């Protein structure tokens, strides 16, 4: 079952603090939010579980210890896994220099703890000089967080959208460019050119990036490496591990083990306090 993601009545754009943060827990069901935008820039940090953000030209996957940065004014929607714990950080547009486009950031332990500490501050505490100093340290650290390629380029082109939706639902059935060319009644060459034009990647690269995102979604939920490999249509677990390591630099087991080495601080304050 899927429920709507909400911010407990909190409306970040009505506040003019340089930065404000709070955390939420998804509960036992997946959560989703419709397309929306904020005046403020938004950083979504995954503590447990994962979140997938959809913007006009890409899908952004956010596993634990990572965050997605969404500049102010960018329309987006979110899908959160069951039992996920997330921290939202809203930043005034002129408060700190951040990327002008969406990106996934690998968040350092220091930066993570600064965000969680800010999330635990009450309304009264947020007005104190100590909080302003904390925010300044956070602003010194945030621009230095390395960007990661945990996104799938897409576009508004109906063929590209159809391919994403159908490959996500049936990755085993839709693995070859020739299948898609037949489905769209066009030549493989023309379809390959369209994919490069719309995404900047070849079909093989684009499909592999989708597989990486789907693999992370499955692994974060607790699926075994063998199950994920089978779901994605790999004949052997070894072949899947090779693809995963090539894309993310580590085997699936080591990657997930690293994501779970840090236990998140319990931080679920009511942002209206």
Curated annotation (Swiss-Prot):
Alphabetical GO biological process terms: negative regulation of DNA-templated transcription; regulation of DNA-templated transcription
UniProt keyword annotation of Transcription present: yes
Occurrences of domain HTH araC/xylS-type (ranges): 158-258
Keyword Translocase: no
Induction: Negatively autoregulated.
DNA-binding stretch(es), residue numbering of this chain: 178-199, 225-248
InterPro entries referenced in this protein's UniProt entry, alphabetically: AraC-bd, Homeodomain-like_sf, HTH_AraC, HTH_AraC-typ_CS, RmlC-like_jellyroll, RmlC_Cupin_sf
Purpose of the protein: Negatively regulates expression of the nimT operon and its own expression. Acts by binding to the nimR-nimT intergenic region.
UniProt-recorded name of the protein: HTH-type transcriptional regulator NimR
